[in-house]
Amino acid sequence: MDHYDSQQTNDYMQPEEDWDRDLLLDPAWEKQQRKTFTAWCNSHLRKAGTQIENIEEDFRDGLKLMLLLEVISGERLAKPERGKMRVHKISNVNKALDFIASKGVKLVSIGAEEIVDGNVKMTLGMIWTIILRFAIQDISVEETSAKEGLLLWCQRKTAPYKNVNIQNFHISWKDGLGFCALIHRHRPELIDYGKLRKDDPLTNLNTAFDVAERFLDIPKMLDAEDIVGTARPDEKAIMTYVSSFYHAFSGAQKAETAANRICKVLAVNQENEQLMEDYEKLASDLLEWIRRTIPWLENRVPENTMHAMQQKLEDFRDYRRLHKPPKVQEKCQLEINFNTLQTKLRLSNRPAFMPSEGRMVSDINNAWGCLEQAEKGYEEWLLNEIRRLERLDHLAEKFRQKASIHEAWTDGKEAMLRQKDYETATLSEIKALLKKHEAFESDLAAHQDRVEQIAAIAQELNELDYYDSPSVNARCQKICDQWDNLGALTQKRREALERTEKLLETIDQLYLEYAKRAAPFNNWMEGAMEDLQDTFIVHTIEEIQGLTTAHEQFKATLPDADKERLAILGIHNEVSKIVQTYHVNMAGTNPYTTITPQEINGKWDHVRQLVPRRDQALTEEHARQQHNERLRKQFGAQANVIGPWIQTKMEEIGRISIEMHGTLEDQLSHLRQYEKSIVNYKPKIDQLECDHQLIQEALIFDNKHTNYNMEHIRVGWEQLLTTIARTINEVENQILTRDAKGISQEQMNEFRASFNHFDRDHSGTLGPEEFKACLISLGYDIGNDPQGEAEFARIMSIVDPNRLGVVTFQAFIDFMSRETADTDTADQVMASFKILAGDKNYITEDELRRELPPDQAEYCIARMAPYAGPDSVPGALDYMSFSTALYGESDL
């Protein structure tokens, strides 16, 4: 294992020296340490918004290592180097190692170079040193600390659990019960420990790790399979994991004890305050009840009715049975609460409770005595008054009962008889009202006897000098007057119902005839309005002529329709005449139809208004179709000429690009003259665009006079211009390539002939197989063996860098020119600079300005990096990196 030491002599550091160094090379242990240490680091790095994926790679530049130390220590380290060179990385790692050493840890055999080189052994050893110093060293249980302290803490916390015997930090944790016991000891609601089995370590470990990650914010540092599948789990990995549990739970017990002490004191104080509040409220409520009750008991004013006196007796009995006993209990409870409160205050060293003024126990006892005195004699007075009223109450009750029954029956009867519902009723409703009225007349006759009995009882009460005789007489007189009025209203309503029935029978016949004729006429008008307002969409003159003929036929039917309208309105006018003559209030409508005369007239007027609008619309559409036809013919005539012309030119360009002869300059001259002839044709295209704009504005979507549309013409024209421009550009590039690479005209012709030979589809490009055949024809030895395939793949990456699957002629020429001509290289440019620099490894600004033109000298000075070699002088520039950057071998 890694070598590290501390200035302190803590025992937890000593056993590490004796561990077998070869154990780290065990793949299972290394895997466990990688996962555990990575998770431990990420649990701290996430506080800074970052993490690591590969522990030996992500710490190589020292940046995240310094950030980790800042997070776990809470201190700032020296400013890191931001460069990407090895010297910068070593500097950053050394800063981190110096910080660890400043905390009293002696690092043995751990150097910055090994960390920067990604040495797994040294990196894991360094992280373990950090874990020991910042996560385990400060653990202290009784007289032990660090590793022994952590082990003792685990043993004490897991002691009550069966099947758990923690003796070390490797095999004692393999069955997973130790982790589960730690969680259950501190958070029993998270794990059902009784359901765990010692023979199922995978489930136990996964349960503990998942619960710790979800609820305790402890990341998963190991896989259960790695622990179970290893004879002796890695001790450092287990210690790291267990230390996370220690830090998660260490503060819980102290906080719980302090919270319990505070809660106990507060509970006693709150209980005493609640007892004080209860006493004050109970005393206040009881005194208020006594204050309200005494005046009620002292009130001896007699009542005039038996019911009122019985109610007083019942209220008094309710008071004795329901209201007073709870108050007696409250009074007793008040004294008990007072004594209990004083005892609790005395036992808890609190001052004695002093109730508010007037709420002492003695005050309550005095008020209670006054209440008892007021009760005396009240019940006997009540019984004597009841006997006195009992003699008159029976007869008065009989009068009230009969009067109430009669009044309940007559309630609403006058309003019902005064109703004029027959004025707005239909014929069927009138007949129903007559039947209902006959039933009411029978009921009215049956109530005559009760009215006579009410009058007799009222006379008897007057003779017996009843105290409430005036109200009895008034009620009796009201009943008699109402009875006479009901008789008169009944006769008047019968006459009105019979008269209305006859009028409605006549009106009903007229309504029926109106409905039979109005419905079909209304349907005809609605159909006519729909047809007249229908938005027609036509594209030819023939279609608009058909619509015009149909419209003329419709106008010929309007006179007969107007006669039918007048006949229907005549029926409605007859109904109105009857209503006005006999003053019938026609609140209802025609039961056979919802069509009104106003609706008929409104729709008829609308039809008359729509007819001339339809005439105008048809006339305008006819003129528009004639104009559209002229536009179609005009566009078709031009398109039928331009379309074939573009197609012919495209075919000619294709032949020219394949069959070009003579020198490249002759070909270029010929193509430019050809391009000029094409560009001169542009005014005709513009004129066609103007005609197309007119067609679009007229919303013309088809044209039988041509098969070409403007989109086809535009695409063809753009393709024509693009094709001629691309062909010219290819020839220009060929000239540039020829001049730059020294290719002869004969070689260029040979390349063109070979390319055209294998371009069998005349697309101007070669596929991979066509290109391969072309190279073979030119003498390249490309076999079908793996070496030949690799060579061909290299060539394809040159000629088709974007991996489009095709090779253009220009790419073909570029490749062939590189293969057949001399080219300058970065080494050649570098050698040239070295000559200018006097055989030095650097060059100065003065030398550049002396040897090169001014603009090119300034270009080099602005882009050359400072030279950093051991033989550097002030102002020295690095021409070597500049030369490689020119050819894409490094960044400029």
Curated annotation (Swiss-Prot):
Matches recorded under Gene3D superfamilies: 1.20.58.60, Calponin-like domain, EF-hand
Residue ranges of coiled coil: none
SMART domains: CH, EFh, efhand_Ca_insen, SPEC
One Gene Ontology term, aspect cellular component: fascia adherens
Region named Interaction with DDN: 274-733
GO terms under biological process: actin filament bundle assembly; actin filament network formation; cortical cytoskeleton organization; focal adhesion assembly; platelet formation
Modified residues (Phosphotyrosine): Y12
InterPro entries noted in UniProt: Actinin_actin-bd_CS, CH_dom, CH_dom_sf, EF-hand-dom_pair, EF-hand_Ca_insen, EF_Hand_1_Ca_BS, EF_hand_dom, Spectrin/alpha-actinin
Pfam families found in the cross-reference section: CH, EF-hand_6, EFhand_Ca_insen, Spectrin
Signal peptide (UniProt feature, chain positions): none
Function text: F-actin cross-linking protein which is thought to anchor actin to a variety of intracellular structures. Association with IGSF8 regulates the immune synapse formation and is required for efficient T-cell activation.
PANTHER family on file: SPECTRIN/FILAMIN RELATED CYTOSKELETAL PROTEIN
Descriptive protein name: Alpha-actinin-1
Gene coding for it: Actn1
